[in-house]
Regions:
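Partner-binding and oligomerization surfaces adjacent to conserved cores of proteins
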Residues: 1-187
Length: 187
């Protein structure tokens, strides 16, 4: 007798404004999400750490290079976080895209929320730095995907491949706009 074990895919959520139609269509048509470089992240305390002069400078160099050569795609574990709808989905006039990540080359990190910044040690990696956020952001329930190292970020903008399961529209999306998006998506 065979055991039929079914593994459900992990579903994550990308909150989006609908103001940039081209970006929305890129996501829906190409099944890809954009990543941002560290310097493009919206939290001014993003990626901070406490440096100790006892730590070899090569560790510090590796962290700085890692910040500048990897893209970050931020997703959430939940689709019903009010502040996420407000901050990232244009005050409920946007959408939340439910996705299953299909990329095999991006690294998954569960974000850890802390009251203090990371202390740099000999074993600290870029992943250790980029997976930590201030505890005030804990409501986001964030999962991050890090791209492979990109040698020339001026010429390359890698995207995270996903399978879209559904699109949830905010309650403030006007019915006419919703119907247009529905036609586009089902075409």
């Amino acid at each position: 007798m065979k055991n039929n074990i079914s593994i459900e895919p992990e579903l994550l959520y990308k909150y989006r404004s609908l103001e940039n139609l081209e970006r929305f269509l890129d996501i829906v048509i190409d099944n890809k999400l954009y990543g941002a470089l560290y310097k493009e992240m919206n939290d001014p305390m993003e990626g901070y750490f406490q440096y100790s002069p006892d730590v070899d400078k090569s560790v510090l160099t590796g962290i700085w290079e890692g910040k500048n050569k990897r893209y970050i795609c931020s997703l959430s574990k939940k689709s019903n976080i009010g502040l996420m709808w407000t901050h990232y989905a244009n005050e409920n006039k946007g959408c939340c895209i439910e996705v299953e990540v299909t990329s095999k080359t991006w690294e998954r990190l569960d974000v850890e929320y802390k009251k203090t910044i990371t202390n740099l040690s000999e074993t600290t990696t870029i992943e250790d730095i980029l997976k930590v956020k201030a505890s005030m952001w804990e409501y986001e329930q964030e999962v991050r995907y890090l791209s492979p190292v990109i040698a020339n970020t001026k010429k390359s903008n890698p995207q995270l491949t996903v399978r879209i399961h559904r699109i949830i529209f905010g309650y403030k999306v006007k019915i006419k706009k919703y119907n247009r998006f529905k036609k586009i998506i089902s075409a």
